[in-house]
Amino acid sequence: MNQWEELQESVGFDFKDVELLKQAFTHSSYVNEHRRENVKDNERLEFLGDAVLELTVSNYLFNKYPDMAEGHMTKMRAAIVCEPSLVEFAEAVHFSKYVRLGKGEEKAGGRTRPALLADVFESFIGALYLDNGIDKVVTFLERVIFPKIDAGAYLQTVDYKTQLQEIVQRDRDVLIEYDILGETGPAHNKAFDAQVIVNGQVLGKGSGRTKKQAEQSAAQFAINQLTHR
Protein backbone atom coordinates (compact mmCIF):
# COMPACT_ATOMS: atom_id res chain seq x y z
CA MET A 1 0.00 0.00 0.00
CA ASN A 2 1.48 3.35 -1.02
CA GLN A 3 1.02 6.57 0.95
CA TRP A 4 -1.93 7.77 -1.15
CA GLU A 5 -3.79 4.49 -0.72
CA GLU A 6 -3.02 4.71 2.99
CA LEU A 7 -4.36 8.26 3.13
CA GLN A 8 -7.59 7.33 1.33
CA GLU A 9 -8.10 4.46 3.72
CA SER A 10 -7.43 6.76 6.67
CA VAL A 11 -9.99 9.40 5.63
CA GLY A 12 -12.49 6.79 4.47
CA PHE A 13 -12.89 7.97 0.86
CA ASP A 14 -11.68 6.67 -2.48
CA PHE A 15 -10.65 9.37 -4.93
CA LYS A 16 -11.54 8.86 -8.56
CA ASP A 17 -8.76 11.32 -9.41
CA VAL A 18 -5.79 10.49 -7.17
CA GLU A 19 -3.76 13.26 -8.81
CA LEU A 20 -6.23 15.73 -7.31
CA LEU A 21 -5.58 14.23 -3.88
CA LYS A 22 -1.82 14.51 -4.42
CA GLN A 23 -2.21 18.13 -5.49
CA ALA A 24 -3.99 18.93 -2.22
CA PHE A 25 -0.86 17.91 -0.34
CA THR A 26 1.65 19.57 -2.66
CA HIS A 27 3.33 22.73 -1.38
CA SER A 28 4.63 25.31 -3.85
CA SER A 29 8.20 24.59 -2.71
CA TYR A 30 7.85 21.02 -4.03
CA VAL A 31 6.61 22.30 -7.39
CA ASN A 32 9.57 24.67 -7.65
CA GLU A 33 11.99 21.76 -7.20
CA HIS A 34 10.14 19.36 -9.55
CA ARG A 35 9.29 21.52 -12.55
CA ARG A 36 9.89 18.71 -15.03
CA GLU A 37 7.19 16.58 -13.40
CA ASN A 38 4.42 19.05 -14.31
CA VAL A 39 2.92 18.95 -10.81
CA LYS A 40 0.56 21.58 -9.41
CA ASP A 41 0.59 23.12 -5.96
CA ASN A 42 -2.41 23.23 -3.64
CA GLU A 43 -3.06 26.98 -3.59
CA ARG A 44 -6.12 26.95 -5.88
CA LEU A 45 -7.59 23.99 -3.99
CA GLU A 46 -7.01 25.88 -0.74
CA PHE A 47 -9.00 28.82 -2.15
CA LEU A 48 -11.89 26.51 -3.00
CA GLY A 49 -11.67 24.53 0.22
CA ASP A 50 -11.84 27.69 2.30
CA ALA A 51 -15.18 28.57 0.70
CA VAL A 52 -16.56 25.02 0.97
CA LEU A 53 -15.56 24.82 4.63
CA GLU A 54 -17.23 28.15 5.43
CA LEU A 55 -20.41 27.03 3.66
CA THR A 56 -20.66 23.63 5.33
CA VAL A 57 -19.85 24.97 8.80
CA SER A 58 -22.30 27.86 8.33
CA ASN A 59 -25.04 25.46 7.27
CA TYR A 60 -24.37 23.21 10.26
CA LEU A 61 -24.50 26.12 12.73
CA PHE A 62 -27.65 27.52 11.08
CA ASN A 63 -29.49 24.22 11.55
CA LYS A 64 -28.07 23.27 14.95
CA TYR A 65 -28.77 26.63 16.60
CA PRO A 66 -32.09 27.89 15.13
CA ASP A 67 -32.41 30.67 17.72
CA MET A 68 -28.81 31.89 17.70
CA ALA A 69 -28.20 35.47 16.56
CA GLU A 70 -26.27 36.06 13.35
CA GLY A 71 -23.44 37.83 15.17
CA HIS A 72 -22.87 34.92 17.54
CA MET A 73 -22.91 32.40 14.69
CA THR A 74 -20.36 34.53 12.85
CA LYS A 75 -18.05 34.50 15.88
CA MET A 76 -18.46 30.74 16.29
CA ARG A 77 -17.70 30.10 12.64
CA ALA A 78 -14.61 32.29 12.86
CA ALA A 79 -13.37 30.26 15.84
CA ILE A 80 -13.97 27.00 13.96
CA VAL A 81 -12.25 27.95 10.70
CA CYS A 82 -9.36 29.97 12.18
CA GLU A 83 -5.82 28.75 11.68
CA PRO A 84 -5.24 27.15 15.13
CA SER A 85 -8.46 25.13 14.80
CA LEU A 86 -7.59 24.02 11.26
CA VAL A 87 -4.16 22.90 12.48
CA GLU A 88 -5.83 20.89 15.23
CA PHE A 89 -8.10 19.20 12.69
CA ALA A 90 -5.17 18.48 10.34
CA GLU A 91 -3.16 16.95 13.16
CA ALA A 92 -6.10 14.81 14.25
CA VAL A 93 -6.11 13.08 10.85
CA HIS A 94 -2.29 13.04 10.58
CA PHE A 95 -2.14 15.11 7.40
CA SER A 96 1.39 16.41 7.99
CA LYS A 97 3.02 13.08 7.06
CA TYR A 98 1.57 13.24 3.54
CA VAL A 99 2.60 16.80 2.62
CA ARG A 100 5.00 17.08 -0.33
CA LEU A 101 7.61 19.74 0.41
CA GLY A 102 10.73 21.05 -1.25
CA LYS A 103 13.98 20.14 0.49
CA GLY A 104 14.54 23.68 1.73
CA GLU A 105 11.06 23.96 3.20
CA GLU A 106 11.44 20.54 4.81
CA LYS A 107 14.72 21.54 6.47
CA ALA A 108 13.13 24.78 7.67
CA GLY A 109 10.48 22.81 9.56
CA GLY A 110 7.68 23.42 7.09
CA ARG A 111 6.01 20.11 7.87
CA THR A 112 4.99 21.40 11.29
CA ARG A 113 4.42 25.04 10.33
CA PRO A 114 0.89 25.98 11.44
CA ALA A 115 -0.02 28.06 8.38
CA LEU A 116 1.07 25.25 6.05
CA LEU A 117 -0.99 22.61 7.89
CA ALA A 118 -4.04 24.86 7.92
CA ASP A 119 -3.68 25.40 4.17
CA VAL A 120 -3.39 21.65 3.57
CA PHE A 121 -6.58 20.98 5.50
CA GLU A 122 -8.45 23.52 3.37
CA SER A 123 -6.96 22.21 0.13
CA PHE A 124 -8.00 18.67 1.06
CA ILE A 125 -11.56 19.90 1.60
CA GLY A 126 -11.40 21.51 -1.85
CA ALA A 127 -10.15 18.31 -3.46
CA LEU A 128 -12.71 16.16 -1.65
CA TYR A 129 -15.48 18.48 -2.83
CA LEU A 130 -14.36 18.33 -6.47
CA ASP A 131 -13.88 14.57 -6.49
CA ASN A 132 -16.65 13.32 -4.21
CA GLY A 133 -19.13 16.19 -3.85
CA ILE A 134 -20.48 18.23 -0.97
CA ASP A 135 -22.16 15.28 0.78
CA LYS A 136 -18.81 13.53 1.29
CA VAL A 137 -17.33 16.75 2.66
CA VAL A 138 -20.14 16.84 5.21
CA THR A 139 -19.50 13.18 6.07
CA PHE A 140 -15.83 13.97 6.68
CA LEU A 141 -16.67 16.98 8.84
CA GLU A 142 -19.10 14.82 10.83
CA ARG A 143 -16.02 12.90 11.96
CA VAL A 144 -13.54 15.73 12.41
CA ILE A 145 -15.30 19.00 13.24
CA PHE A 146 -19.00 18.65 14.02
CA PRO A 147 -18.51 16.50 17.17
CA LYS A 148 -16.47 19.34 18.69
CA ILE A 149 -19.27 21.77 17.89
CA ASP A 150 -21.78 19.39 19.49
CA ALA A 151 -19.59 19.21 22.59
CA GLY A 152 -19.83 22.99 22.97
CA ALA A 153 -16.17 23.66 22.21
CA TYR A 154 -16.97 26.88 20.36
CA LEU A 155 -19.92 28.24 22.31
CA GLN A 156 -17.66 30.55 24.28
CA THR A 157 -15.88 32.70 21.75
CA VAL A 158 -12.84 34.16 23.45
CA ASP A 159 -10.53 37.13 23.17
CA TYR A 160 -7.37 35.01 23.22
CA LYS A 161 -5.05 37.92 23.99
CA THR A 162 -7.05 38.75 27.11
CA GLN A 163 -7.23 35.10 28.13
CA LEU A 164 -3.47 34.68 27.72
CA GLN A 165 -2.85 37.75 29.84
CA GLU A 166 -5.09 36.36 32.58
CA ILE A 167 -3.32 32.98 32.51
CA VAL A 168 0.27 34.23 32.69
CA GLN A 169 -0.41 36.98 35.22
CA ARG A 170 -2.12 34.81 37.82
CA ASP A 171 1.01 34.35 39.89
CA ARG A 172 3.36 37.13 38.84
CA ASP A 173 3.86 40.25 36.79
CA VAL A 174 4.95 39.45 33.26
CA LEU A 175 5.71 41.33 30.07
CA ILE A 176 3.68 40.23 27.04
CA GLU A 177 4.77 41.50 23.64
CA TYR A 178 3.41 40.90 20.14
CA ASP A 179 5.59 41.19 17.05
CA ILE A 180 4.44 41.23 13.44
CA LEU A 181 7.00 39.05 11.67
CA GLY A 182 6.00 39.86 8.12
CA GLU A 183 3.29 39.72 5.51
CA THR A 184 2.66 37.66 2.39
CA GLY A 185 0.28 37.74 -0.55
CA PRO A 186 -1.04 40.43 -2.87
CA ALA A 187 -2.47 43.70 -1.58
CA HIS A 188 -6.08 42.49 -1.81
CA ASN A 189 -5.40 39.23 0.03
CA LYS A 190 -2.60 39.75 2.51
CA ALA A 191 -1.70 37.40 5.35
CA PHE A 192 0.24 38.56 8.39
CA ASP A 193 2.50 36.47 10.63
CA ALA A 194 2.84 37.30 14.31
CA GLN A 195 4.45 35.93 17.46
CA VAL A 196 3.77 36.47 21.13
CA ILE A 197 6.68 36.82 23.55
CA VAL A 198 6.27 36.39 27.30
CA ASN A 199 9.19 37.57 29.41
CA GLY A 200 11.52 37.21 26.45
CA GLN A 201 10.34 33.72 25.45
CA VAL A 202 8.39 33.06 22.25
CA LEU A 203 5.29 31.11 23.28
CA GLY A 204 3.24 31.13 20.12
CA LYS A 205 3.12 32.05 16.46
CA GLY A 206 0.17 32.50 14.16
CA SER A 207 -1.12 34.20 11.06
CA GLY A 208 -4.26 35.98 9.95
CA ARG A 209 -5.79 38.25 7.35
CA THR A 210 -5.18 41.26 9.61
CA LYS A 211 -2.48 42.07 12.15
CA LYS A 212 -5.05 41.74 14.95
CA GLN A 213 -6.12 38.30 13.71
CA ALA A 214 -2.49 37.21 13.52
CA GLU A 215 -1.91 38.33 17.12
CA GLN A 216 -5.06 36.53 18.28
CA SER A 217 -3.88 33.39 16.48
CA ALA A 218 -0.46 33.61 18.16
CA ALA A 219 -2.12 34.06 21.55
CA GLN A 220 -4.31 31.00 20.97
CA PHE A 221 -1.25 28.88 20.17
CA ALA A 222 0.45 30.16 23.31
CA ILE A 223 -2.58 29.18 25.40
CA ASN A 224 -2.54 25.70 23.85
CA GLN A 225 1.15 25.39 24.72
CA LEU A 226 0.61 26.45 28.33
CA THR A 227 -2.47 24.32 28.96
CA HIS A 228 -0.98 21.14 27.46
CA ARG A 229 2.31 21.17 29.34
Curated annotation (Swiss-Prot):
One cellular component term from this protein's GO annotations in UniProt: cytoplasm
Localization: Cytoplasm
Main location: cytoplasm
Residue ranges occupied by any DRBM domain in the UniProt entry: 159-228
Protein family according to the UniProt entry: Belongs to the ribonuclease III family.
PANTHER family per record: RIBONUCLEASE 3 (PTHR11207:SF0), RIBONUCLEASE III (PTHR11207)
Subunit comment: Homodimer.
The protein's name: Ribonuclease 3
Organism listed in the record: Listeria monocytogenes serotype 4b (strain CLIP80459)
